[in-house]
């Protein structure tokens, strides 16, 4: 079993996991998965910044020009295309050492009795659908 989720959906998945009321080992597994996803999210944030910097106009020293806390982007359309592709890339957390954690968290989601609504309902569905591989 593995968790395979798009970069753009990692933050929502973390929020859903954080709202689950769990005890004991299930709580430990949830926290472990949150840590793994948080590490991936940090990578995504850094890579997004790097991508934006690569499209930013540069000053005489080769540093990106920032105006009103935003990069001065030279090729906006190309950046948007790359960002869309980047956000749709999937992060994979393989079973391996995390097999028990992934199965436990999926089971916790199935047993969850929270009535999700709005964006949280979409985030819950996206997270649940990100689990792949069944009971291998």
Identify the residue ranges that each predicted region occupies:
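A composition-driven surface/loop motif
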Residues: 1-136
């Amino acid at each position: 079993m593995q968790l395979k989720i798009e970069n753009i959906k990692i933050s929502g998945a973390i929020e859903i996991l954080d709202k689950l009321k769990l005890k004991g080992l299930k709580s430990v597994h949830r926290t472990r998965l949150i840590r793994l996803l948080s590490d991936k999210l940090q990578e995504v944030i850094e890579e997004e910044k790097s991508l934006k910097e690569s499209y930013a106009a540069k000053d005489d020293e080769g540093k990106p020009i920032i105006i009103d806390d935003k990069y001065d982007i030279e090729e906006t359309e190309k950046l948007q295309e790359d960002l869309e592709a980047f956000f749709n890339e999937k992060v994979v957390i393989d079973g391996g050492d995390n097999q028990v954690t992934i199965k436990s968290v999926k089971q916790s989601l199935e047993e969850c009795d929270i009535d999700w609504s709005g964006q949280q309902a979409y985030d819950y569905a996206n997270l649940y659908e990100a689990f792949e591989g069944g009971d291998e």
